Amino acid sequence: MPFFTTDDRVRLYYDVTGSGPPLILIHGLTASSLYFHKQIPEFSSRFSVVAPDLRGHGRSESSDDHLTIARLAEDLRQLMDFLQIDCFSVVGWSMGAHVIFEFIKRYGCGRIDKIAIIDMAPRLLKSEDWSFGLPGVASRRPGDFGHEDNLLVLSSML
């Protein structure tokens, strides 16, 4: 199984399947690259499909710090650098779409050829001005979403 290590020494899982122009598939919160298991065989006939497990998800390690969308975008940049991918198309589902937009905010659009956004909520967490976010989340700083928060969300779905 392929892993790469980020600059803060967290091992992140990724899979590369097929050949052709790079297509990156970014999963949503509490999911993994396995979310795309039915799409990967189809896409891999025309693309080199890169399907990472985001930090704290799937087969990737967590870190001591809380998850932030900014950190996930940095992890994506580091993975693209590691794989020597200069230009790619990207699909972001749910939180994965937020990661893409953060990537663009931080690094621009120069490396991105095409974008597909699937089922993205405008905001993940509840706040005073957004009542449609996830309930009962114990985030300590804006933009944080730690392991404890993940467990709270999952337990609220039972």
Question: Where are these predicted regions, by residue range?
Answer:
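Residue in the alpha/beta-hydrolase core beta-strand immediately N-terminal to the catalytic nucleophile
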Residues: 53, 89, 113-116
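Glycine-rich phosphate-binding loop signature in dinucleotide/nucleotide-binding domains
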Residues: 18, 82-86, 109
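Conserved acidic catalytic loop of the alpha/beta-hydrolase fold
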Residues: 70-88
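Short, hydrophobic alpha-helix immediately C-terminal to the catalytic nucleophile
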Residues: 37, 77, 101-102
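Conserved HGGG/HGGXW glycine-rich cap/lid loop of the alpha/beta-hydrolase fold
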Residues: 6-65
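Conserved alpha/beta-hydrolase "nucleophile elbow" surrounding the catalytic nucleophile
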Residues: 27-29, 88, 92-97
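Flexible "cap/lid" loop of the alpha/beta hydrolase fold
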Residues: 98-154
